[in-house]
């Protein structure tokens, strides 16, 4: 039990006590502007809120002045419904404060990361943050395993649980009170809490702020997996060192907040499995094992009980699915992954005798699902639900080259993300949709026909939709008889992709 106590201890020397005053510093909002995620408030057009870019610094100074006033950051018990963000710019001010608040709250986790890397002498590699690095790991590990569990991590049902989760990391009471105020204020005035009381995390506004809260919640949910995995393994497990999303905390620190101590050692043997692997991206995780179906059911039961006891979450049975790898497609990060048994016959000639040997190899395959991808493209209004390309409305002052570059960039980014597909037919279908949608958009702008417009542009229009992968592969396989066939089946994984493509995110 002494080792268990080590997991329950919190390193208080690194907890921050003076984060709240940083909220009144102008450079914090500059950091939020420079390092914010795409889609945050600072990357939205300022004219949408009635301001231009030149006055953004003035807005921050005005906001800090308002916060210095005594009544603006104090939540009164008697006037709990009164908002500090009065006026028609309430949402805008709230989003600015939440962006700066997220930058401040990330400071303790950044310090933990630096300290963890120094103690373990781990080089900080940006390549390990790529979500594409998961698939080579799958290819190396999953082909030798038997069962896989698709897990949807439940959302926090109560706001106070989110605050208490961060309380374990941060001892700055004013910051925690402000966080509690933010959550209740936004719940009362917006759609933070849905009718089912689940958190709306990945909205375009306040994305960094909600990612911080969500990542802390997910870390607590999976902490029990890290602890049990280390206890059950015959060899000492190695921390991954990084998370996958950009604003994750990048350090999987091995400690357990709450563990049932009764009959602990007696229960632990039920989960012993030296071939257990766990990966996660956002709210979906995968638990793969070489063990039996019974072992996976025990893991499922343990996770459900842990979430119920620790987070007061009632996890539905359909949030954890257990399947065999050999007859199941694993949907993860916009790919359909599977393990297929490939058989081949090898003829061996030895002097006067010859032998035929049957060999079977487990091959990991990744495919792009066509129906969900077309649904995402249709949702972005490039085509209808049947996949028929349609024109998009554009600004009258947009040049033809800008429109073509925009459509070409969308396809290149999508093709770049799905470059690991074993079959490229789905991407060619998407290329056709985007190319024809672009042509229809330009023809609509010039009040012409698509045929006449394509005839006028010629090959220059087609080159905009030629990806770097196709150019490189055409050079590599230019001496072979069928370079197109080779390029159709070549899988390429990139180590610079740190977030899922918006069109590939079908959830």
From Swiss-Prot:
GO terms for biological process: mRNA processing; RNA splicing; tRNA processing. It comes from the Eukaryota. Keywords: Chloroplast, mRNA processing, Plastid, RNA-binding, tRNA processing. InterPro entries: Domain_X (IPR024937), Maturase_MatK (IPR002866), Maturase_MatK_N (IPR024942). GO terms for cellular component: chloroplast. The keyword Chloroplast applies. It is found in: Plastid, Chloroplast. GO terms for molecular function: RNA binding. It holds the Pfam family MatK_N. Belongs to the intron maturase 2 family. MatK subfamily. Usually encoded in the trnK tRNA gene intron. Probably assists in splicing its own and other chloroplast group II introns. This is Maturase K. The gene is matK.
